[in-house]
C-alpha cells in the first residue's frame, strides 16, 4: 500500500474551504442531524461545515473537527471561536485516539485524497458508538461534465491531474465505489444518495465554483513532480478563465453521499 501523498495546500485552498456550507455543500446531511448528538468531522478543513453542524446539534451536542493541515485548523479556530460546542484539532485521522466515541462521523471530499480509504473507514468505524452512523461525501472525477467543453489546455491539464492522482494511489471514482467499501468494512444499512454539484448562472457565485480548476492549476506541485510543463499550466489557467467569462454555461461535478451503520 502506498503512503498517502502529501498535497500542497495554501491560502487559496483555505478560501475554498471557507466558502463551503452545510446547506450548499453537504445538502442532504441535515436529515440525520439531531440535537444533542456527538459528531466527528474527518478532514474538516477550516470547519466551515462543522460549525453549521454544531449549530444544529445545539449546546447539548458537540462537534469535533480534525484535519492534518495546520493552516486550516488555525484559520477555523479564529473564524469560529464563538461556536462553543465546536472543537477543531490539528491531527491525522490515524493518530486520533479520543476517549469518547461518536454518534455520527462525517467526512466530505476527503477519501478521494487517500490511497488507503478502506483503512480510513475502519479507523472511523472504531470511533463510533454502538449503533453509530457514518456519512461519506465524495466525487467521481471521471465523469466531470463541462458545458460546453473547455479549452484543450484545460482538458489536457485535467487529464494529467487524474493521472497524477491515480499514480499516487488515489481513486478517481471513489464516489461510485463507496457502497462496496462500506460493505467490505462491516457497515450495514448502506444508502447511496446522489448529491451532484451543478453550477450555472442561476447559482450564487457560479463563476467562482466553475473556476475551481483554475485554483487547482494554481498549484505547481504537478510541475515540480514532472507531470506537467509550467507553460501548459499557466496557459490552462489563462484560457480557462477566459472561457468562464465568455462561453461557460454550466459544470456538473458527480458527487455521492454514502451512509452506513454499525
Question: What annotation goes with each model-predicted range?
Answer:
Residues 3-5, 11, 191-249:
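C-terminal helical/coil "lid" or tail adjacent to the Rossmann-like core of SAM-dependent
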Residues 118-133:
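A short glycine-rich, Lys/Arg-flanked "PGG" loop and its adjoining helix->strand segment in the class I
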Residues 135-203:
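Conserved catalytic/acceptor-binding region of the Class I
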Amino acid at each position: 500500500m502506498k503512503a498517502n501523498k502529501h498535497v500542497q495546500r495554501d491560502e487559496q485552498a483555505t478560501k475554498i474551504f471557507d466558502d463551503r456550507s452545510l446547506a450548499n455543500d453537504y445538502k442532504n446531511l441535515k436529515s440525520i442531524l439531531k440535537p444533542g448528538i456527538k459528531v466527528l468531522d474527518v478532514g474538516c478543513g477550516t470547519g466551515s461545515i462543522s460549525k453549521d453542524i454544531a449549530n444544529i446539534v445545539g449546546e447539548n451536542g458537540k462537534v469535533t473537527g480534525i484535519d492534518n493541515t495546520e493552516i486550516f485548523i488555525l484559520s477555523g479556530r479564529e473564524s469560529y471561536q464563538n461556536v462553543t460546542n465546536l472543537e477543531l484539532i490539528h491531527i491525522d485521522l490515524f493518530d486520533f485516539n479520543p476517549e469518547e466515541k461518536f454518534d455520527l462521523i462525517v467526512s466530505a471530499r476527503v477519501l478521494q485524497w487517500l490511497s488507503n480509504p478502506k483503512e480510513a473507514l475502519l479507523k472511523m468505524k472504531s470511533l463510533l458508538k454502538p449503533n453509530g452512523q457514518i456519512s461519506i461525501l465524495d466525487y467521481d472525477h471521471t465523469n466531470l461534465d463541462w458545458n460546453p467543453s473547455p479549452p484543450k489546455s484545460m482538458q489536457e491539464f485535467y487529464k494529467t491531474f487524474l493521472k497524477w492522482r491515480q499514480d499516487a494511489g488515489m481513486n478517481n471514482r471513489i464516489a461510485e465505489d463507496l457502497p462496496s467499501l462500506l460493505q467490505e468494512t462491516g457497515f450495514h444499512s448502506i444508502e447511496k444518495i446522489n448529491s451532484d454539484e451543478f453550477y450555472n448562472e442561476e447559482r450564487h457565485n457560479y463563476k467562482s465554483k466553475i473556476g475551481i480548476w483554475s485554483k487547482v492549476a494554481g498549484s505547481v506541485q504537478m510541475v515540480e513532480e514532472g507531470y506537467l510543463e509550467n507553460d501548459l499550466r499557466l496557459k490552462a489557467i489563462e484560457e480557462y478563465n477566459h472561457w468562464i467569462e465568455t462561453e461557460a454555461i454550466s459544470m456538473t461535478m458527480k458527487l455521492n453521499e454514502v451512509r452506513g451503520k454499525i
